[in-house]
Amino acid sequence: MESSGEGEIRRILVAVDGSPQSIRAVRMALNIAKAVGASIDFISVSELSDIPTLMAEAQNEQSEEYARLALGMSMKLALAKGVKAEVVLRKGHPAGQIVRYADEIKPDLIVLGSRGLSGARGAILGSVSTAVSRSTGYAVLIVK
């Protein structure tokens, strides 16, 4: 893991899905970013169904729409707070995509909610926070 300096936080990765815990994670990350002058990358993952059916296709579309809405809301909050932010939408397994993106951007901190939406709307599930924290060498803040 590369860092911008000993204990410095310059770039924060925040996983979002629109759940109450995710919104709290966004707000906490924005407060941290504002205090230390860091930028934020918001990621939302549209989880794809493994079973190719008409119902699964509708669920995939709904999952992607929720992911886009969560990213839009997060960006609005960042703009209101005056924090530089970018958004990225990925498709696939949430934990794997979050860890993969973290490896690409090398954040100083990853922030995510302890639990997320479930079912077709589940871009980030509760087990995702555990999987991310176990699968990466970056600092992880899990918000309840």
Predicted regions and their residues:
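Generic structural signal for helix capping and beta-alpha/helix-loop junctions
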Residues: 49-50, 95, 119
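Gly/Ser-rich helix-loop-strand patches that form or flank binding pockets
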Residues: 1-4, 100-144
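Structural beta-alpha unit
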Residues: 1-7, 76-110
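Conserved beta-strand positions in the Rossmann-like core of class I SAM-dependent methyltransferases
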Residues: 41, 86, 141
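A short acidic, glycine-rich active-site loop
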Residues: 58-69
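Small/aliphatic-rich secondary-structure junction motif
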Residues: 5-55
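Amphipathic, non-transmembrane alpha-helical secondary structure
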Residues: 23-30, 34, 72, 95, ...
